[in-house]
Amino acid sequence: MKPKIKYDLVDMLKYRRKHGTESIKDFCEKYLHPVFGYPDVDDNYELIIGKDPKICFAAHYDTVHTMDGMQELEISNSTVTLAKGSKSNCLGADCATGVWLILEMIHAGIEGVYMVHANEEKGCIGSKALVKHNPRWLDHCQVVISFDRMYQNSIITHQSGIRTCSDNFANSLSDILGMGHM
């Protein structure tokens, strides 16, 4: 039986992960390199678990922070927020949670193609580069589930003006998750 690795979501949220900064490099060294190895030429991380996985799980590791470094957080009633007086412009919870979920799924041995993209907040640069350099990278996958979100109760159907799923899929998923119709 493999030991339980506990990835620390709160610690992950402390990193301001603006693309190209020291704090994003530190984040990758601490959380992504030990699991994925080093990234491809476009700074994307990929790992395949299983013989013929049909599902791809995706997230991105950059944030819309405007500065480098660490941020202080407060935890109250199981809710994490920026500390009072914080100079940060965002918490960065959607992408940190996506990376955390992917790390936990990999550790649990869940079969799939795992992709963690770079520089998505600046116009999907990491995912576009992946498709440009390897247009057939997903041919064997039937489904892509991207752990990204907007606000607290949303299913994203478009990103950068590009449809990411049908309204029928979004409404069905919304019903399954108990969110009501979109």
Where are these regions (language model features)?
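N-terminal, Lys/Arg- and Ser/Thr-rich interaction peptides
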Residues: 1-11
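A non-catalytic alpha/beta surface segment that caps or lines the substrate-entry region
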Residues: 11-53
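Intrinsic-disorder/low-complexity, polar/charged segments
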Residues: 18-21, 62, 167
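Short secondary-structure junctions
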Residues: 33-42, 77, 175-181
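General beta-strand structural signal in soluble alpha/beta enzymes
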Residues: 39-42, 57-59, 82-84, 114-116, ...
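Intrinsic disorder/low-complexity detector
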Residues: 42-48, 54, 64, 96, ...
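Active-site metal-coordination/substrate-binding segment of hydrolases
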Residues: 51-111, 122-123
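Acidic/histidine-rich catalytic neighborhood of metal-dependent amide-processing enzymes
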Residues: 87-91, 95-182
